[in-house]
C-alpha cells in the first residue's frame, strides 16, 4: 500500500511507513501527524491502524474513503482519494504467462520426474515442492494443507478410492516435523500400507531458508540436536525406511517400485540439500544447446 500511495500522490504528500504494527509506535505517529494538515490511513481490510490512530485523539480518514474488502491498487487509491482514473500505458505485445517453477538444480525435480514417469498418484503438501504440481512436471494430484498429504493418502487408501500400490504422499522435512508425524503414526496404527516420501532438502525452502528440527541449528543459527528422520520413522513402527538421492533417477525408480509393492507402510527419504544453500558446492553445470 505504501508503494501504491507513492505512485498515486508522488511528492504531493508526506508518508509514514510502519515497519512494525504491534505494538504501534505512539510517539512516531503523533510526531508525524502533528506535521501534516490531513491524515489518511491507507490499509487493506479491517481498520486496525485507523482505529488505533483515532484512539490517540488524532482525527484521520480511512475506511470512510477506502473499501474494506479486497486488495488495493493504484487504480483503487486514485479513484477513492482523488476521484480520477489513472492513465495506463498500453502494452501492445502480449506478455507470456510465467507461472512459478522449481528452481534450476532443485533436488525435488528428480523425485517428481520419477513419480511422473511411473504415473504414480501423488498426495502433495505445503512447501516449495508443491511447485511439482506445475508444468512441465505436473506430478502432484492434490494439495490441501500442512500434513494433509499423509493423512489424506491414508484415508484414500483405506477407503479403497486409490490403490496404495500406485500412490504416495510427498511431504517436506520441516512440514513433516510440523504436522506429518501424527499422520504417519496413524498409518501404522490403522494397519495401513501407504508409502510416504519425505522430501528432505535440509532447510525450510519455501519461506526463506529457516532452520527446522532436522537441520541441527536453531533459528538463530546456534548448534542444536538434529532430529533423525530415519530413527523417528523406525520408532513409529516403519520397518521399510529408505534414503535415496533424488538426482539418482534410477535408484529412485527402483526404490519406489519396491516400496509400492510391499504389504506394509514404507517411507522413502528423498535426501539432497537445497541447491540454493551457501554450503552446497556447485561442481557441475549444464546448459541447453539450442542447436
Name each region found by the language model:
Residues 15-17, 41-43, 60-63, 89, ...:
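General beta-strand structural signal in soluble alpha/beta enzymes
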Residues 90-150, 159-162:
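Active-site diphosphate/adenylate-binding microenvironment
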Residues 133-267:
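Thiamine diphosphate
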Residues 7-16, 231-237:
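Short helix-loop-beta junction
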Residues 4-10, 27-28, 51-55, 72-73, ...:
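Short acidic, glycine/serine/threonine-rich loops at helix termini
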Residues 14-88, 284:
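Terminal amphipathic helices with adjacent charged low-complexity linkers/tails
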Residues 22-23, 47-48, 66-70, 129-131, ...:
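Short gly/pro/ser/thr-enriched loop/turn and capping motifs at secondary-structure boundaries
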Residues 91-105, 243-261, 274-291:
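Ferredoxin-like iron-sulfur electron-transfer modules
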